[in-house]
Amino acid sequence: MDRDNEVPLPKPKWIYRTGIGQDSHRFLPESSTKPCILGGIIFDHCPGFQANSDGDIIFHAICNAISSVTNKIILGKVADELLQTRGITDSGIYLEEALKSLKPNQKISHVAITIEGSRPKFLCKLSALRQNIAQVMNLTPTDIGITATSGEGLSDFGCGDGVQCFCVLTVMEYCD
C-alpha cells in the first residue's frame, strides 16, 4: 500500500483498559465465630478468614483490579485508614471507595473472577454471588463471570487452608 494514499484512522471514542487483581486469606480455626464472607455473601459451615477486615477475598481482588487501572491504592491505604479511624471492616465499603476512584469518563463493562479453594462449596452460590457483586458495582449479573476450582489438593488453597481469588476487569474510557 502506498503510504501517501493512506487515510488516517479516526480517533477512537472509547479506549479499553484491563485491570487485574488478586487476594488470598487463610482460614481462622474451626472454633472461630467470625463468618466466612465472599462477594458480600455469608457462607455457612466454614470459618472466617485471618484478616483485619472481614477478609472478603472476592471484593479485595476486585479492589486490586480497579487499583491497577486507577493507580489509587485502596487496600493497604484507604482501607487501613477506614479501619483505624472508623473501625470499618466491611470490604463492601472498600469496594465502594475503589469504584469512586474511577474517573467520570470510565465505566467497568465486565468483571471476570476465578476462585480457588476446596471449601466452601461455591457452585450453589454462584448465582447469588453474581447478583450481589453486580448490585454493589451497579452492573448487571451478565457483566459478572465467575469460575471456581477446588484446586484438587495441589496448593494450600486446594488443601483447604484458605481461599484465593483473581479478578480481571474491563474498563471503557470515553475520549473526546
Swiss-Prot record:
GO MF terms listed in the record are:
2-C-methyl-D-erythritol 2,4-cyclodiphosphate synthase activity; metal ion binding
Q: Is tRNA processing included in the keywords of this UniProt record?
A: no
Keyword Coiled coil in record: no
Positions bound to 4-CDP-2-C-methyl-D-erythritol 2-phosphate = 23-25, 149-152
Q: What keywords appear on the UniProt entry?
A: Isoprene biosynthesis, Lyase, Metal-binding
Among PROSITE patterns, the record links this protein to: ISPF
What's the Enzyme Commission number for this chain? 4.6.1.12
Listed binding positions for a divalent metal cation are: 23, 25, 60
EC class, as a word, reads lyase
Identify the SUPFAM superfamilies for this entry.
IpsF-like
Q: What NCBIfam families does the entry give?
A: ispF
The protein's name: 2-C-methyl-D-erythritol 2,4-cyclodiphosphate synthase
Q: Which organism is it from?
A: Chlamydia pneumoniae
Which gene underlies this protein?
A: ispF
